Amino acid sequence: MILLVGLGNPGKAYAGNRHNIGFMALDQIARDYSAPPFRSKFNGLISEITLAGERCVLLAPQTYMNDSGRSVGEAARYLKIEPKDIVVLHDELDLPAGKVRVKTGGGNAGHNGLKSITAHIGNEYRRVRLGIGHPGDRALVHNYVLGDFAKSEAAWVEALCKAVAASAPLLAKGEDDAFQTKIFKDMEAALGKNVP
């Protein structure tokens, strides 16, 4: 069993924010694999699918980003899931827009959602870092991540969420390198020379 977590802030006001790309990718996975409707549990919204023969619990914490660990910790304890079987989809400032990297453990790179999760379950969980680019100046970061994606970014955001969903079975199997490679190829196929 794996716990697949998408990070974001709840509510319509935040729905299109760059910080919510984890929610967007999780929603795409739920749609593409015909997940039952999300229901409230663990201070979040949960559903369940099967990926590559693995039971996969989908979790969108509803605690606001900075307290995501409360929801993830609660789910992990109840489901008796080890950190190595938890995969967190989140926005990543330090990657160019549309790029994806998977890593296990390590620091939080200033990401408050990851900081909270690490405080609750330790840092040995897997992270799917979804690149949103950087505004160029640290002083602009807060407004940038809490700002909506521009209309000009819609094509790559949609292509990235679809590519993550299409490659999700590889994540479930622990084939992180193959997951990254497939996303790169899918993005290239979808956007051609317009890959960001």
Curated annotation (Swiss-Prot):
CDD domains: PTH. It comes from the Bacteria. It catalyses: an N-acyl-L-alpha-aminoacyl-tRNA + H2O = an N-acyl-L-amino acid + a tRNA + H(+). PROSITE patterns: PEPT_TRNA_HYDROL_1, PEPT_TRNA_HYDROL_2. GO terms for biological process: protein quality control for misfolded or incompletely synthesized proteins; rescue of stalled ribosome. It holds the Pfam family Pept_tRNA_hydro. The record marks D91 as: Stabilizes the basic form of H active site to accept a proton. Its EC number is 3.1.1.29. The active site is at H19 (proton acceptor). Keywords: Cytoplasm, Hydrolase, RNA-binding, tRNA-binding. GO terms for cellular component: cytoplasm. TRNA binds at Y14, Y64, N66, N112. Its main location: cytoplasm. The record marks N9 as: Discriminates between blocked and unblocked aminoacyl-tRNA. It is found in: Cytoplasm. PANTHER family: PEPTIDYL-TRNA HYDROLASE. Belongs to the PTH family. Monomer. Hydrolyzes ribosome-free peptidyl-tRNAs (with 1 or more amino acids incorporated), which drop off the ribosome during protein synthesis, or as a result of ribosome stalling. Catalyzes the release of premature peptidyl moieties from peptidyl-tRNA molecules trapped in stalled 50S ribosomal subunits, and thus maintains levels of free tRNAs and 50S ribosomes. This is Peptidyl-tRNA hydrolase. It comes from Methylocella silvestris (strain DSM 15510 / CIP 108128 / LMG 27833 / NCIMB 13906 / BL2).
